[in-house]
Amino acid sequence: MKFKSTPENITLVQNAFQTIQNTTGGISLGRKSLPDSITLIKESVLTSMTKLGNSYPFAVYQDKSNIYHLVYEKGPYLLRKGGDKKTILSVHNLLSKLPLGLFNIAEENGNEELVLEWINKYPDWSPLHVSAAVGLEKYILKESQRSDWEVISCQVDSHDGKTPLHIASEEGNDKIVSLLLQKGCDLSKLDIKGENSIHLASRKGNVECISKMFEFGDLSKNINIENENGETPLHLAISNGQVDVVEYLLLFKESDIHYLKIKGFSKGSILEYGRRIENKNTSIYKCLTLLCQSYPELINEVIDKDKNNILHLSTDKLFLQALLSESHTCTYIDVNATNRFGLTPIHKAILNDNLSILITLYGYGCSINNSDPSGDTPLHYAVRSGNIQIVKALLCFNANIKAINNNGESIMCVLQKSNHSNKDIIKKCLDLFESQGNIQDHTDELERFEQSNSMAYQLKKDIENKKHSVNVLSLDGGGVKGMVIIQILLYIEKRLGSDLMKHFDWISGTSTGGIIAIGLAEEMPLLSIQKLYLRFKDKVFIGERPYNSEVLKKIFIDNFGNKTMAEIKSDKKVFVTTVQGNVCPSELCLFRNYMLPGFSDEINKNRGFFQLNKVPIWKALRCSTAAPTYFEAVDNKYIDGGVMANNPTINTIADIQLYNTALNAKNQKPHEISCILSIGTGKNPKKTVESLNVNLPTGITDVITTARSIINLKNIFLEQLTSADGEPVNRARSWAHTMKSPFFRFSPTFTEDIELDCKDDNVIVNMLWETEKYLRKDGACDVLMLTGFLENFKR
């Protein structure tokens, strides 16, 4: 009869083990405080002591200080020593019962010392336990011929109740596991904690042992057994971060013969179990990701009496990302599920004042406008709680500021009824979004004249000429600050009241701008790109620089597949920049989805036009984003395009001119640039540089000053090398106006430095908020002019 892991049976086993221990006379065998490792002992030391009795090879010696030494005389090895004669003799008596054949085989295999280590730690183990721990296959084969094999193979140790199969599984001796199972050992046997051998192998990550259990044992009937804490082998593998074991166990999900249980555990949801694991590491998060990837429906599982699911209860951002990172795209996951009170996970995050959870949930598709049964939206909750950062985040993510609850209360009305200290600040935030503000033109008279003339020229063109005109969108580099570009595009689109991208024909991007450019060319909605970035930053910027380039590559493949530049979905022309850095001087390269029309492959190649079907989108993006010190160069050759063209506007104009030359050469009508929209990733605040002089130092003060000057000059050099604002913008604007093309540039100035790899949610929210303020104030006039031009430039 199989032993079931019920509380009553576990108590029975525990009582039985206590009886076994009592037979030793209540003597401690050293389990609570294990002895030191065995050591060689000199013969001269032994001869200086008195041997008690004539036993061999285990013997007890007494020194002049009345300290007793347990010795294995073949070494000789000192196993343990102490002043308690009774304990030492008790251990000696146990070891003396071990058969010499065990040691002879251990000597043959060179494992004699290892055997001694084990028996010194666990003197109550049987020879089979020791053999299972060490891997003495020959001894086990010999013992299996005995008539009482069925009895001795099931013997348990007096402390943990483990059989030899338990020990072999725990120690990762897969050959022994295989042998014991083939010789009839029972996989269903439980130790004192109610754990079978699968539990032990899972905890230690011994996936090969579990594989042998599947091959030679009854894995299907024992894979879901719960221990005294309600944990199955899958639970233990997850809590110990054993990724390989979790991957293996998940192979048995819902198959015809084997079924891995994932619900209905005595202690509740396995995801809730995962949430409560303390000090979670990367491996544990990976295990949880694998689980949800295989069983995404677990995310919908109701966990408690309030009908919360795991998304409602999550307060750890990394845990939440682990659950959603590979499963959020599943159509049957309800990320907006409501609990008993009608609250979504976003509502709960706001009640917990947890900005990071809110942003993570939004990034993985949770709605920020769903209301509770009272009609309160997340923004109602946020203004009521008084969390400024959460209010700003919701507004930046386009929360409905005009929402009215069932009591007829607007967002502003709920705020006015609140009594928290942030009331006035939040009112200013709401006012910024509710009013159009006082739109002022911040350009000078000369620039207004050039821009007005250019707009007038383009708007007066006839339909035929307009059809041959192209509107250009150019996107700067800047790492995570690419979210600024997305925020600006979303705002312009909202003001325009229609799909912004239908107005643009030629898109270019550098680094982060390249990602957005490709996303737009692939017809990804702006909100989808925004959410991609919110997920992206926490996946990529992990640990120290340089970051793992393979993670970046995987993100690109997950979103764009293995399509080449030639297979880009829309008919828009697009390119991303990169730099060939393995030559000096370095060379700017463009990965395009177009070639020079009417010219041979050779001429195209000479002009730097790559064969489109040989450049995967993911590789073009990896090259463009390979920022030095942040990510590895691609093919030890290509680095971030921002090194030479962080603002690719001029390069875009030049490329269109080259394309037009090809058209002219083939007697085709060239394209005229009708509008240029250049979007930056924001400017860090200006800083005063105190010293620039580099002289030979004459004293310690001069050394410090010179060192500062060198650092300042280095910073100036790097800033100018990768500059996207200032002169690059002035040159692009001048060139555009020379062609009678209106030029629009948007790039806010921040109040604090923002690093390319920033992933701090508070900093990100402030960055987006300052972008929104800029668009509604300093940039408001340009937004109005741009949207007016696009609406009236009919083609």
Model-derived segments and spans:
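Extended, amphipathic alpha-helical scaffolds
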Residues: L271-E272, L311-S314
